[in-house]
Amino acid sequence: MSTELEKGNHMEDVLRYEGTRAVVTGAASGMGAATATILAALGAEVHGLDIRPCGGAVHGSHLVDLSDTDQIDAAVEAIGGPIDSLFNCAGLPTTAPDLAVMLVNFAGHRHLTEAVIPLLSDGAGIAFVSSVAGMGWVANAARNLELVMTPGFDAARTWCEEHPEVIGGMGYSASKEAINAYVAFRGFQLAPSGVRLNSLNPGPTDTPMMPSFIESQGQEFFDNFPKPVGRNARPDEQAWALVLLNSPRNSYTTATSHFADGGFTGGLFTGGIDMALLMPPE
C-alpha cells in the first residue's frame, strides 16, 4: 500500500471523499478491507458489512450475511442516510455451493443496493467487484437480463434453482456476469438521477480467497495464467480502482464494466493470449 497510508498521513482530498459516508461490504479482508482503509485515510466515514467483525478503519462494523435479507435491511436501517458511496466487495469463491455463490455475489448485493438507493446523496457512486470471469456477460445478455429483472431476492433464488444448466458448476462466473448485466441495466435506468453504477473486473488478486480459487482450478492453472505485468494484483491496487470509480470526480462514468487485470483482457481480445492453452486436454 502507498507510503502515505502506511504512515497514517491524511491525504489531500483530490477525490472528494472528505466528510462523506461510505458503505463497504466484505470490509473485514481483501479488497474490501483495503478499500475501507483508503476511504478512511481520505476522510470518509466508513461503515463495513461482513460476516466477521471489520477492522479499525471502519466507523461502524455490521455483521451481515448477504444471503439473509433481514440482516441486510437491519444494517441499512442502522447506518441510515445520507450515503455517498457503496462498495460491493464481498463474495464467495468457486469452492462454495453454486446457489450460495449466486445468492451472496449477486442477489444479496442487488438487494442491498436497492435498499441503499433511496438513501443516496446527489451524484452518489456504487461500485461492484465483478471479475474477468464475468467478461462473457454480453454474449449471454438475454439470459443475464432475465435474472437481473427478477423482482427481488426470493425471485432470483427461484430463477437460479430453476436454471441448473446455467449455474451448475459455473456459479461464480454466472454471478459475475449477472453483476455486470445489472450494472449496465440499472446504471442506465439511474443515469438521469446522477447516481452512478459501475463494476470492476479484477484479474487474479492475492486476497484470502486465492487459496480457494487454487483449490478449485488447480495450482497449474494459476501458475500458467497469463500475467502481462508479471504478477498477480495486490488488494490495494484493486481498492484504488474502486475508489476512483466511485469518486465524485468520476461523474460521467456509469453503467460500465471496467477491467483491472494487468492487460489480460487486452491480450485476450486482440489475440495475444490464447486461453485454449490453459484448458485441460479432453
Task: Tell where the protein language model's regions lie, with residue ranges.
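Short, flexible catalytic-loop segment of classical short-chain dehydrogenase/reductase
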Residues: 201-212
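Short, small/polar-rich loop/turn modules that mediate ligand/substrate recognition or access, typified
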Residues: 191, 196, 253-255
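Short C-terminal tail/terminal secondary-structure segment
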Residues: 4-5, 9-14, 254-282
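Canonical Rossmann dinucleotide-binding motif of NAD(H)/NADP(H)-dependent dehydrogenases/reductases
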Residues: 12-46
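Catalytic loop of short-chain dehydrogenase/reductase
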Residues: 93-94, 99, 125-192, 204
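Alpha-helical segment proximal to the catalytic Tyr-Lys
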Residues: 118, 188-189, 251
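Rossmann-fold cofactor-recognition segment
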Residues: 56-70
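C-terminal helical subdomain
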Residues: 111, 164, 168-172, 177-180, ...
